[in-house]
Amino acid sequence: MSKPTAFPLDESRLPFEIPRDEPYREKIARLGQMITDRIPAKKGILTKDDPEYWGLASIVTDEMADVALKMKVRKPMTLPELVKATGKPAGELEPLLQQMAVVGLLEYNWENPRREKQYILPMFVPGSAEFFNMNKQQIADHPEVTAFFERMTFLPLEHITAMVPPGGAGIGMHVIPVEKAIETENRSADIEHISHWLKKYDGKYAAGPCSCRMSRAAMGEGCGDDPDDWCIGVGDMADYLVETNKGHYVTYDEVMQILQKAEDNGFVHQITNIDGENKIFAICNCNVNVCNALRTSQLFNTPNMSRSAYVARVKPENCVACGRCVEYCPAGAVKLGQKLCTKDGPITYPKQELPDAVKWGPDKWAIDYRDRNRINCYDTGTAPCKTACPAHIAVQGYLKMAAQGRYRDALALIKKENPFPAVCGRVCNRRCEDACTRGTVDQAVAIDAVKKFIAEQDLNAAHRYVPDVVQPSLQGPWPQKIAIIGGGPAGLSCAYFLAVQGYKPTVFEKNERPGGMLRYGIPSFKLEKNVIDAEIDILRELGVDIRCGVEVGKDVTLAELRRQGYRAFYIAIGCQGGRRAGVPGEDAAGIETAVHLLRTVGGDESRKMTGKTVVIGGGNVAIDAARVSLRCGSDGVTMVCLEPRDKMPASPEEIAEAEEEGTKITCGYGPKEFLSENGHVTAVVLKKCTGLYNAEGRFAPTYDENDTIALPCDNVVLSIGQCIEWGDLLNGEAVQLGRGQGAVADALTYQTAQPDIFVGGDVCTGPRFAIDAIAAGKQGAISIHRFVQPNTSLTIGRNRRDFHELDKSNLALGEYDRAPRQSAALDAGIDAHRSFRDAHLTLTEDQVKIETARCLGCGASVVDPNKCIGCGVCTTKCEFDAIRLHRDLPECSKMVRSEDKFKAILPYMAKREIKIRFAKKEK
């Protein structure tokens, strides 16, 4: 009986087999045919290949089928009525009915004047397909019921969703908005408020597991949520859930806590929509990545299947393109665009095509809707600052908050993406400023300086911001143990983001103090140690266990940690070794790597260096080494680099500061050999660099061996690259190493060939900046959360964090603030040229007001009303009153009984057909 479908179930991808080897059971086939809404199945004979057959056959006995076949779908029957219909005595029948209810084939209520218990044979969806999947043991014993549920939310609908009118025609579930989002809407109807339904069923609530979350996980496509208690049965359904061991009673206050936690996580409230406007039996809190009900609108691109009466609208004048609404919108209806006009006027953004007046079929569907709905911005681009930042921090947002004096809110917004704003406010390489549109006018906004001002709160324990834990679970902290190897920016970032998801990770750090290269690779005159300590203390407040002086691979192995119960590992040990030049004489005393020098001085600032120092290298680390050498007492420092002056990798600001302190720079040369006397270096012989890259664009310097100069010196610091020192860490592991001995990992998930090992930071990418490591740490945390939760996909519905910069050459800026860029002063009490103390002060509050006013406000969110389902999740994430719900579609609140669905569908279908024909004639 199975008919071809445009989206067949790929059984090869299921972690179980659907059994078909048992003898054919005619009663099961008849029962499936009686219950199903699938028209082809109603007209023919079910086979073993039909999901209605194998779904029921897995758990329904022939004795149960005999009873069910005496019933009619959704027609309540009392025990005496069933005794009469089946001929079975009550003493034998009642336990059987109870067992049928426990497995989920029957439900019951007391909706009659005498409040007599009635048994009901429900439809499949919403009904028995869900009930089958509300028992973990039943799923474990009969996993095929999960695929049955999935098929029953697809096959009966694939040919009719385009014909479903606003309101949903009594099919399935329906979105009900976040109550706070419509409180001020005086035209709202009672049935549009969750409070209406809670009042209607006052005191009759039960929380049960989410059948979608459990079934999808069993199919290998879990979302990482704990499934328990997200679904709330109301009225008689609450009693049914409790009496059949599918749920437990909850109070009104507990219901409100569940709803609030759902909103915190960005879940969508839905109510059942098969009984008209006077009855529901459940309120669900749905994750679009697994929800079979939301799938009916998202996969088929037919929003009428889900949408409420409300549509979100953005107030561009308030919007700052922070992207929070975009990240949480379940329908992908909100994307980042631009607020600034082009030279040709405002951009017109495309809208999703709707099935109202066009033929609709698989070519119009979005099979990959879970990924497609996570697209962040339109192709025309958005704010360059957010795009350029590796962590994609909401720069425009926190600048606006700072302008409004909302400094704590600004800090909280930054920490959505970066747990170390005080650190980054001092040492970030500021790609946001390089991209800033204001830089095309005069100078970029001093974004980092404003961030530093905001983050000063973190340096005072009384005022620091510790984020709330937002966990997709109602059962308390996650029990899974996670080990993070390496306490640098990537590892600590991963720990932070795991902690705010409800984990208690353990960080293993081989050094005496955590911080990695932040502590041991960046001099204190740029980043004071107390700044690092203050922000790391916040991780401890979140429950992160940081164990220093432990070298994994030496003091304890990964295998031993597994035996201790650790379920996943994030390796982020950085590039802690320095590369040598590979030229004669480099073993002489007095020659060391920059990594070694900076680590040594980072732990002991009393180190002394005498005589002249030559630093080989042209990057920021070489600059740091030169400046440290001067502070350690060197008589003079010369930097030597291969690159010409205008191609030096170090930032212009760093170069200027080094030269101001007395460092000399020689460009276009590399080391040929080191000269020594009595084993100690006395000079470096340099040779002229004639080219840096080969024909393929790879770094492959060439030299003129005859064009040489000699620089006398007493110390040489090599800053020509860093390397990874794995030690015995990976012994016995399947992790593969690639170029530069970096760990090979998936570009999106950071998972290695050893499934429970993830990597991040420099061990994966090679030496980069702190903000790159911080961004990688968050992605590692996302992957690890998904990995340790049962049967969860690492990729489905994952935000790829792809952003596009708007076209800065095609803007009509109009009026803007003309103030010049602000700069922080230096502390006159500190010798900025020779002290190890940081002499840089922060901007004053007045300067912050001036600087934030310089922001041009490039970006804004844009809502596609054709995709919006009116859930209101976006409004809960916006802190700028920039997005609100409006009751634009009151017809979407029309609730009808399932039995009357064709009374709603047929008139709409006829009107739609006329529109389609008329549209064809117009063409």
What residue spans do the PLM features occupy?
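A short, conserved structural fragment
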Residues: 101-112, 334-335, 883
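Ferredoxin-like iron-sulfur electron-transfer modules
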Residues: 58, 88, 119, 270-283, ...
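A conserved FAD-binding loop/helix module that cradles the flavin
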Residues: 763-788
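Flanking helices and flexible, charged tails adjoining ferredoxin-like Fe-S electron-transfer domains
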Residues: 331-384, 399, 445-447, 451-481, ...
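FAD-site-proximal beta/loop scaffold in flavoenzymes
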Residues: 587-610, 694-767
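Glycine-rich dinucleotide-binding loop and its adjacent helix/turn
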Residues: 454-475, 534-554, 578-632, 737-753
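Beta1-alpha1 glycine-rich phosphate/pyrophosphate-binding loop at the start
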Residues: 393-396, 402-403, 444-448, 484-552, ...
